[in-house]
Amino acid sequence: MFPSRIPKARFLLATALLFTLGLSAETKHRRPAPPHHPKHTHHKMKNGNSVERRSDGRVSDVHNESRHMDVHHGLNGDRRVTAYRADHSRIVTERGRAGFVERPYSYHGHDYYHRTYYYHGRVYSHYYRGFYFHGVGLHVYVPGAYYSTGFYGWAYHPWHTHVIYRWGWYGHPWYVHYGYYFAPYPYYVGPSAWLTDYVISTQLQAAYDAGVAAGSAGPDAPVPSDGPALTPDVKDQLNQEIQFDIELENGEAALEASGQEGDPGSSGIARIFADSHPHVFVVGAPLDVVNEATEHDCALSEGDILQTTTAPGPDDKAATLTVLSSKGPTECAKDTAVSVTLDDLQEMQNSLRQTLHQGMDELQQNQGKDGLPQLPAAATAAPTPTAYAKLAPPPDPDAAAELQQQQTDADQSEKEVTTQEAQEPETPPAATQPAAPIERPR
């Protein structure tokens, strides 16, 4: 049921060699041109506004040039609004989910980004490093603080006993709702297994809360007779991915402690596609992807699991992954091959690492409680803030109000563009004249 542990020698070797890819490249924030879906119609107007519609006529994307605003309507009913501001910051909001204000800044001549998230009245910060991969500008997560080497070693290696832990969310509405999909391990052989359940449960709770806020949570489904859809085998693959990420963060922490900067090419998805091993991604936000067999949309949501198949080609802006688990008929089916943009994959990895770091915070703070083992003395030191986090621009004091206002502005923005779309029919391409016949010598 539980994965074999990666040998200690590999952990030490990987820590020493982790940042040798040499792939780093900076990226200034710029508005990406979204790829056009092969089955969608795209109507671009004279003033730069545009509307993209699905094959059934429903709007998927609206771009308002004068407002510098993009609105995306997901298949599952979610709406994401992104606004770009003159100072190169951006605001991103999603119905019922955490929104953020992102501001760029420079540290040691490199591009960094500070996101201030607002969720259920809480304010928290995350940090990112700019990086180009296959010509796509990515924002790669970098922790705002690192633990001691002793803590990462403890988090990586197994416990000396099986730990039975009772989660506080048993009986909560979200857990009842997703009982058909997820069940925690019956016991834990080490921190990475506990963190696996922490990551999945955190993502599912966020999805449920967003559904309740939008009035679209749906009825609870019965647990299948053969067990939850998220199988132990798939969870074990995620467990192994979490071990890799603990390994990764330990290497980053060593560089930070020595006054060096990490390489975003080693910390982001470039590293994942550089080796020959399959890797798994956890979907961290609602996402529409392309079913490669049908070229139609299908939806993914928090807690769905994807696996890499092959690395993208040098000119590819998306990668092919296989769906290992999803939540029923409204989403991409299990074993479906889907095309996912590199930017979306990087955001999935960012979400996993952010949630993983949050889980490590809880492990350290709750050591010795509810069955969790006590930490060794070498693992009890508080995380040390990074130099780049200390120099980040402060949170926007008006950001909470701006996030709320953006949802209202998006309503007006969409209305402006769709009204113009109706008044300005798309001009069909000019008919080409048939080529003159070629005179051949007699």
What annotation goes with each model-predicted range?
Residues 276, 301-304:
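Residue-level recognition of short, solvent-exposed, well-ordered loop/turn junctions
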Residues 59, 282-283, 305-310:
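A structural signal for short, hydrophobic beta-strand segments that form beta-sheets
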Residues 291-302, 310:
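SH3/SH3-like (including bacterial SH3b) beta-barrel domains
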Residues 235-288, 311-313, 317, 334-336, ...:
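SH3-family beta-barrel domains
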Residues 325-347:
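Surface-exposed edge beta-strands and adjoining flexible/disordered loops or tails in beta-rich
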Residues 304-333:
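SH3/SH3-like beta-barrel superfamily modules
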Residues 1-101, 377-442:
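Extracytoplasmic low-complexity, disordered linker/stalk tracts in cell-surface/secreted proteins
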